[in-house]
């Protein structure tokens, strides 16, 4: 939040949803906790947007980067619910089936921390039949599981920038101009 154009950036981000639903697809930065339905995810994302619109956004955001709470509960304060929601939708890779988040590992999927799984591997995941497009995990390139579309193909690391055209279900990729 120290960028000289932070107010312009914040205004833009305030206008963007944390989760986007289009036809039978969901778009999210990192993932959706396995215990959440679409309405849970949208409702909690809207709570974050309400807080951003009604409070000082810079002050609110300064309280959001923390690893706690690592689990969601209706008993959490609104601030804690917002922090969990931001962490889940924006930072999550590994979690437990109850949605307990793990942030210490940024590893490939075959290096899962003990007791955790990739958020989309949980057998009890509610959104099994919904296409979910997400980024945030460049080591998943080439990964294939039904209804799960990891879209971070490592452009920032000199690899590919990718997009998915929903109308004809086409993946479009462009090599990074930086190269490896």
Report the location of each language-model feature:
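Conserved hydrophobic/aromatic beta-strand scaffold that supports enzyme active sites
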Residues: 12, 19, 27, 88, ...
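Conserved beta-sheet core of the metallophosphoesterase superfamily
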Residues: 41-49, 113-175
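Flexible, active-site-adjacent loop/turn segments at secondary-structure boundaries
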Residues: 30, 46, 87, 92, ...
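Hydrophobic N-terminal alpha-helices or hydrophobic patches in metabolic proteins across all domains
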Residues: 1, 35, 101-103, 140, ...
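Alpha/beta-hydrolase fold catalytic core
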Residues: 65-141
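Residues that form or immediately flank small-molecule/cofactor binding pockets and catalytic motifs
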Residues: 18, 32, 94, 137, ...
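Active-site neighborhood of divalent metal-dependent phosphoester bond hydrolases
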Residues: 1-78
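Short C-terminal domain-edge/linker segments immediately following a structured domain
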Residues: 55-63, 120-121, 162-167, 179-180
